[in-house]
């Protein structure tokens, strides 16, 4: 019986994923006792890009932006997504699924109007979910 595929691969072949934009949760949530090493995006097996939920936050400084403004938070969120996709070697045109989390249904129109500017002609499957809160109180959309 053959060994597992992993054990037969040469070390350089074992890198199946490209990881983009590392960060640690203690930078995003300094008031919490978290210390997790994560990435904003991962290109898996050179075929699919997985993004961490994006919010209105500067990817470098972790500064939260546009508190209370759903449209501007959405614009920053979409800019982050576009940047991460670019780093992964693709574009918004390749997006086939998007899930949006809102903290209040009243933000839906502003959020979807802004998202529509970024996804015009793309036609992804989209799901919107209203939640009681996101990880930070100033975030209204993710």
Residue ranges and their predicted role:
Residues 2-93, 97, 102-142:
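N-terminal presequence-like segments and the immediate start of the first folded domain
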């Amino acid at each position: 019986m053959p060994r597992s595929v992993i054990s037969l691969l040469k070390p350089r072949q074992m890198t199946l994923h490209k990881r983009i934009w590392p960060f640690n949760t203690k930078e995003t949530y300094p008031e919490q006792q978290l210390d997790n090493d994560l990435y904003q995006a991962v290109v898996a097996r050179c075929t699919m890009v997985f993004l961490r939920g994006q919010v209105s936050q500067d990817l470098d400084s972790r500064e939260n932006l546009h508190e209370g403004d759903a449209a501007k938070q959405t614009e920053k969120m979409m800019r982050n997504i576009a940047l991460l996709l670019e780093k992964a070697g693709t574009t918004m045109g390749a997006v086939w699924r998007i899930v949006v989390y809102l903290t209040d249904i009243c933000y839906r129109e502003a959020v979807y109007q802004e998202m529509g500017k970024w996804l015009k002609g793309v036609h992804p499957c989209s799901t919107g979910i209203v939640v009681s809160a996101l990880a930070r109180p100033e975030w209204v959309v993710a």
